[in-house]
Regions:
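Extracytoplasmic
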Residues: 1-149
């Protein structure tokens, strides 16, 4: 039977065009010139919600020590056009047997790398979760990194 079936080529795109005023209901990969990336500047975007949807990064820690944790901030047009609008991203940082909350105030943050905090990580994997809980219309999961102190 398989030899009689036509091979169907997957022509779907990995990235979708999105608009911040009508954000997708599930995490959707998209591109933007202000996202982090060397060749492809991409991120995931979702409509703001109650915090039940998360984007998770798993970061390998090469050796135990103090690390600074950074998130790459992207500010969409919603913040640029409305000066009174406030919004912050809610992160959960899981390492060893700890779970800590971290926040970035998007009104005060600069675009680009913004520090989430300083942590002592053992040589293992750190999980950083960004929730969809936000007062803005959408949440953008761009990039995270750790830098040893």
């Amino acid at each position: 039977l398989p030899k009689w079936l036509d091979k169907v080529e997957d022509t779907s795109f990995k990235y979708s065009g999105i608009s911040w005023w009508r954000a997708p209901l599930q995490w959707t990969a998209t591109t933007n010139a202000k996202y982090y990336g060397k060749y492809i500047r991409s991120a995931y975007v979702i409509k703001s919600g109650d915090g039940s949807q998360t984007a998770t990064w798993k970061i390998p820690v090469p050796e135990a020590g103090q690390y600074e944790l950074y998130y790459h901030v992207f500010k969409d047009d919603e913040l640029r056009w409305n000066d009174r609008l406030q919004g912050e991203y809610h992160f959960r940082v899981a390492y060893d047997s700890e779970m800590e909350d971290a926040y970035i105030n998007l009104r005060k943050a600069n675009e680009g790398w913004e520090q989430l905090g300083t942590y002592y990580f053992s040589a293992d994997t750190v999980r950083v979760m960004l929730t969809d809980e936000c007062k803005l219309r959408s949440v953008t999961a761009d990039a995270v990194k750790i830098v040893k102190r």
